[in-house]
Regions:
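Catalytic-core regions of hydrolytic enzymes
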Residues: 1-80, 84-94
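Charged/polar, solvent-exposed surface patches and flexible loops
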Residues: 51, 100, 142
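Active-site-adjacent mobile loop/cap segments within catalytic or ligand-binding domains
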Residues: 66, 73, 111-167
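Active-site-adjacent substrate-binding region
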Residues: 89-114
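Sec-exported extracytoplasmic/periplasmic mature domains
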Residues: 13-24, 31, 57-61, 99-108, ...
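Short, low-complexity, polar/charged sequence segments that are solvent-exposed and flexible
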Residues: 46-47, 83-87, 101-104, 147-151
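A generic structural signal for alpha->beta connector loops
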Residues: 23-24, 79, 108-109, 124-126
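Active-site/binding-pocket entry motifs
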Residues: 35, 104, 135-136
Length: 167
């Protein structure tokens, strides 16, 4: 069975490696198949998100990247997309750079989306949620399992981070 968490972890590790080669200091919220919630958390997902926010603050991150893969009942949906929160104007600036790079490199027709997710409301660290494609789309599911495509996605994100910090 192909699961989002496994592909996302591989993409994230590749992204970490590429960013570190560029001189970035990278903190991963996970490097194994585990979440950040504790056994005492009644609401497991909320506990995981809360601990991620604490990490952003603890490490005084300059940017956070939340990597995901979409899934939708319509299997023809495809393409990478970027979600941001309007609380911090830097979120939209970075999101625009990244979405434009996804459009150029992958031909993604999706648009930058504004969102109001829990994590974004509770941190001042600039960042975005990145949907690398659709696991529900057979073509993208096939591609996202390939190491070469994971490297390509990571390169697009890395190049976007570099552009963001150079501007």
């Amino acid at each position: 069975k192909i699961e989002e968490k496994d592909i996302v972890l591989e993409i994230s590790k590749e992204l970490r490696d590429q960013l570190m080669k560029q001189g970035a200091i990278v903190y991963m919220t996970r490097e194994r198949d585990e979440d950040l919630s504790s056994k005492w958390d009644e609401r497991k997902k909320r506990g995981d998100l809360y601990r991620r926010i604490l990490m952003y603050k603890k490490y005084q991150a300059d940017l956070y990247l939340s990597i995901h893969i979409n899934y939708y009942s319509d299997t023809t949906e495809y393409g990478a997309e970027v979600l941001y929160n309007g609380i911090n104007p830097q979120n939209k600036i970075f999101g625009t750079i990244l979405m434009n790079n996804f459009k150029t490199a992958l031909g993604s027709k999706r648009k930058l989306k504004k969102t109001d997710l829990y994590m974004y409301r509770n941190t001042t660290v600039p960042g975005v949620l990145i949907e690398c494609g659709f696991l529900s789309n057979p073509n993208e599911r096939y591609l996202m399992q390939k190491s070469s495509y994971q490297k390509k996605l990571s390169k697009i994100i890395t190049d976007s981070v570099i552009t963001y910090f150079q501007n």
